[in-house]
Amino acid sequence: MGMLVEGRWTDETPDPAIGRFNRPESRFRSRITADGFSGFTAEPGRYHLYVSYGCPWAHRTIIFRALKGLEGMVSMSIALPDDRRDGWRFGTGFPGATADAVNGFTWMHQAYSAADPHYTGKVTVPTLWDKATRSIVNNESSEIIRMFNSGFDAMGANPGDYYPPHLAAEIDRINEVVYAGLNNGVYRTGFAGTQDAYDEAVGRVFACLDMLEQRLAGQRYLVGDTLTEADWRLFVTLVRFDAVYHHAFKCMLRPLSSYHHLDNYLRDLHQVPGVAATVRLDHIVTSYYSSERVNPNGIVPILPALDFSRPHDRDRFARASSFSRAA
């Protein structure tokens, strides 16, 4: 996939750095706040979310939009999962994908050029757009989910705090571990350019999975009995693991289904009201296997059935009674 250079779309120049995958930092880092002190006030109908069902980083924001009941406050455009040689594209040529009803953009990079005509860098989803100023608020998923978590509470968002202050330090700690070992670790494995880089990365992936399996043997969620942001950040990788990362990214030591506690935990989260509708395996599989870098011949495999609606055994653990799940 290419990038923008001084506001113009161009083919990407590969990074030859010792065969290891390096994820660039997000560039737009403003925040929406209830008081508008940041320059962006929380207002129903003002903001628009550009996403892909295939992308795990975008999936985080789709989940939080659903959990917090923001569908009527933050509109959303869903990119096509296939043929991303010129970046993320919008249209109705794939079930569940949409046109851009706000700006009429065909390509995601058009939003970046509109926000900054001299922008140089990657064009990514999720991207949170401000209709009032015609600018990008933020394209960092970890920050967008925090805005969705609490920024619209005064406007009637669903109850529930996925980043409670008394658990923030532990959530941050486990987030760092899961990001390095798994969220980004599967990409470091799949895009490794040398055997040494691959061996190092895949070892970290399964060390992280082993640690999480042990942790979840004695508690319902990553941070005890409370469902938090950390669980949703892990969920988006787990739900893709057997469908794409196990084969396409060469994480083949063990399938996720062989981890008893993680497999049940995944189904527990998938069955939280509102979450199943955010998981589109057709988009996920097409998105990864249509990538020339991952799968040069572009053949999209037919998967065995992955049934996340099967019963799980996680109800044997306590769940914090003060937390209200989305209805």
Please name every model-derived segment:
Residues 1-327:
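C-terminal alpha-helical interaction module
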